[in-house]
Swiss-Prot record:
GO terms for biological process: spermatid development. Component of axonemal radial spoke complexes. Residues 199-218 are annotated as: Disordered. It comes from Danio rerio. The lineage of its organism: Eukaryota, Metazoa, Chordata, Craniata, Vertebrata. Functions as part of axonemal radial spoke complexes that play an important part in the motility of sperm and cilia. Important for male fertility. Involved in fibrous sheath integrity and sperm motility, plays a role in PKA-dependent signaling processes required for spermatozoa capacitation. This is Ropporin-1-like protein.
Amino acid sequence: MPLSETMYCAQQINIPPALPNMLKQFTKAAIRTQPRDVLQWAADYFSALSKGQDLPVKKRLELPVATQKTDTGLTPGLLKILHQQLTSKETVTKDELLPKWKALHLPVEQLDTILALGNFSENINWMQFFALACSALGGSITSALKHACEILTEDPEGGPAQIPFHMFRSLYTYLAHLDGEIPEEQIDSFLHSLEGQAQSQGGMVQPSNFTSLHTAEK
């Protein structure tokens, strides 16, 4: 004789008050992030949530980047997640970076390429790594800096994407010196021109200040 199914009435089912909103936020996060492995991403999501860590969640849904050769790889949204998770540290180790990179299902080969380009040792300067990662998104120095502004800004989406001049100067100087083909006087001239604009903008720089300048890169 088959076992009868246990029947419950509504009064017997106790739904934790926080559960509906938690599941709603999880669903919205999954839709925005579009993880390739939903099960693994869900494990990473709830693990971070239980530890009070930054969640591996994109701020908005990203359309595929047309210039990418494949449908995998770093995107501005994923880089922003990494930055939110690691920006509190001036330096990180590969052992700290690798799990977070893998949690976003990014190719390890791309991470190794960025680390090799920066010639990083065991301790990785996070903002230098961030600058190179922006280069991986855009290719040119100007494109990399534009991505950096859009990721680092506290302006709302669609705003001018301003960042402090001192932060911009550090990113640009690092990339320009790493490039090795931009004369020092050209670097100084570009920064001097941009500093004047920043002073009239409360010490802030935005992409429209430099995307029209040809002195940003050779």
